[in-house]
């Protein structure tokens, strides 16, 4: 296990370095960051100001030197200042990260509490109306795009019926403001949970030891939840960790549709406005979250399934 952990930490470090190189290269391909300053106010800047600004931002040095200086500061927690807000990137990200985590957690809870039980029910009641309902839910959930679900939810429940707010997030905790964004973001994953849980449960329910347990007179609920579900939960567990990380890193569309003040919407704005410090900070944060969650899921295998061992 120790060798596995050390190896994974090494891979995580290499991945973060590759992500930093990619982000830095793409930021330079999109244009000189000084152009953003030149466009402010609509009057531009003089050549002397252009050169002075380049020295201030370190843009007068070769690209490898620029990257090295930026990487050293990033490892120290200094990602620079936002070119739009004129605030430190850590402060700008800190203002939005809690909103994104709230949205991701709500979507994950919806997907888990709907998809997993529905998958178990569909497997236990195979070829019944519950099975057909579950498979239809999975089909619709994985074919309808999330932005369409969000837009239709706003049109029906906010505009037509007036039951729920159409978007934005107040400063206080409001359950009504979470309902539509969380359902829209978690719908696709709930369908994935359902299909994965159903498939895993069917494989386990058809195994010999389950048939033996039933032959010994073990109650149906005990067979399903103690014996079958425990062994069928590993594939959904893998999916769970990756999906939770995906909610955090991939909520750009939903945050844009519902005007949610989170990291996804901020990442989109930083890309369109060429705000490199914020864009780099968000991408590195997203990469780190995904790698850490994936690592924790892999480690949890050994504790859930004793058959799995890491060398």
Q: Which residues are covered by each model-predicted region?
A:
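Alpha-helical transmembrane segments of integral membrane proteins
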Residues: 2-3, 16, 97-130, 146, ...
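N-terminal signal-anchor/signal peptide hydrophobic helix marking the start
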Residues: 6-12
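Hydrophobic aliphatic residues
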Residues: 26-30, 41, 74-75, 83, ...
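Residue-level recognition of pore/gate-forming positions within transmembrane alpha-helices
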Residues: 12, 43-44, 139, 155, ...
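Generic alpha-helical secondary structure signal
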Residues: 48, 62, 66-70, 74, ...
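Hydrophobic alpha-helical transmembrane segments of membrane transport/permease proteins
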Residues: 15-68, 161-178
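An internal, D/E-rich "acidic patch" concept
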Residues: 59-116
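Membrane-water interface segments at the C-terminal ends of transmembrane alpha-helices
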Residues: 21-30, 57-58, 72, 136-165, ...
């Amino acid at each position: 296990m120790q060798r596995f952990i050390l190896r994974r930490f090494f891979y995580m470090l290499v991945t973060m370095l590759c992500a930093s190189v990619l982000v830095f290269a793409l930021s330079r391909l999109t244009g000189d960051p000084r152009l953003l300053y030149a466009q402010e106010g609509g009057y531009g800047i003089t050549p002397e100001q252009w050169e002075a600004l380049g020295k201030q931002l370190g843009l007068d040095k070769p690209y490898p030197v620029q990257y090295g200086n930026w990487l050293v500061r990033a490892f120290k927690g200094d990602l620079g200042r936002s070119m739009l807000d004129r605030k430190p990137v850590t402060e700008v990200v800190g203002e939005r990260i809690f909103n994104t985590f709230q949205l991701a957690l709500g979507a994950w809870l919806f997907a888990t509490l709907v998809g997993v039980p529905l998958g178990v029910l569909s497997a236990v009641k195979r070829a019944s109306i519950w099975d057909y309902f579950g498979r239809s839910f999975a089909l619709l959930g994985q074919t309808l795009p999330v932005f369409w679900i969000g837009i239709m939810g706003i049109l029906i429940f906010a505009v037509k019926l007036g039951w729920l707010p159409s978007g934005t997030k107040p400063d206080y905790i409001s359950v009504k403001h979470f309902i539509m964004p969380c359902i829209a973001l978690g719908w696709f994953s709930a369908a994935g949970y359902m299909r994965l849980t159903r498939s895993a449960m069917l494989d386990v329910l058809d195994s010999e030891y389950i048939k033996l347990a039933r032959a010994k007179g073990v109650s149906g609920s005990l067979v399903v939840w103690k014996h079958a579900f425990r062994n069928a939960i590993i594939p959904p567990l893998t999916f769970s960790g990756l999906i939770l990380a995906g909610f955090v890193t991939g909520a750009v569309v939903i945050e844009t549709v519902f005007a949610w003040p989170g990291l996804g919407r901020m990442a989109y704005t930083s890309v369109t406005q060429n705000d490199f410090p914020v864009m780099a900070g968000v991408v590195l944060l997203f990469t780190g979250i995904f790698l850490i969650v994936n690592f924790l899921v892999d480690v949890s295998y050994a504790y859930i399934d004793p058959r799995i061992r890491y060398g």
